Amino acid sequence: MPINLYSKAVFLKSAARVNQLPEDSGYEVAFAGRSNAGKSSALNCLTNNKNLARTSKTPGRTQLINLFSLDEQRRLVDLPGYGYAKVAMEVKLEWQKNLAHYLEARQCLRGLILLMDVRHPLKDLDQILVNWALHRELPVHILLTKADKLSRSEVKNAVLKVRQYYELAEHLVSVQAFSSVKKDGVEELISVLDRWYEWN
């Protein structure tokens, strides 16, 4: 599949709850991560569109489930960022409930791209999200973002650490380094997405 197919992503809709999402059919791949993990930047990098997902200096800005259409059957899903301290507790709990509901109930979900800051991987909520996915045998591809902030050896060690942590689930969990700034890791991410979307 040509790399530029992801650049055809267009905004489809926003949903506050799972029951507001489009019909549960086709293929969806969800992007999730802590509020400061660089999720919007990664989506913009993948699609080569700096305006696709709104980036903000204020973590926790994405409070809705945002869907982007690749074609009639395939969608990218930007899930609300989680774990930001300045968000009210009831809002946090609502987000987490929506995340859990989406991951457990959405039958067209083919995989989860989970973003973690390479300097601070494996936070509690990250692990909870992976466990939710593994509970329903959903593949997870972990992007260790902001790899440009560390040396190559530090990045390599971080990737190894996360791989070892999930080695018992290696049939479902894969890990790579990623930098939106340098566009490092984009092709590896695309190869995972291509497989999940079953592009012919």
Swiss-Prot record:
GO biological process, one term: division septum assembly
Residue numbers binding GTP: 33-40, 60-64, 78-81, 145-148, 178-180
Pfam family, one: MMR_HSR1
UniProt keyword annotations, A-Z: Cell cycle, Cell division, GTP-binding, Magnesium, Metal-binding, Nucleotide-binding, Septation
GO MF entries: GTP binding; metal ion binding
Cofactor field: Mg(2+)
HAMAP family: GTPase_EngB
Role played: Necessary for normal cell division and for the maintenance of normal septation.
Family: Belongs to the TRAFAC class TrmE-Era-EngA-EngB-Septin-like GTPase superfamily. EngB GTPase family.
Name by which UniProt lists this protein: Probable GTP-binding protein EngB
Gene that encodes the chain: engB
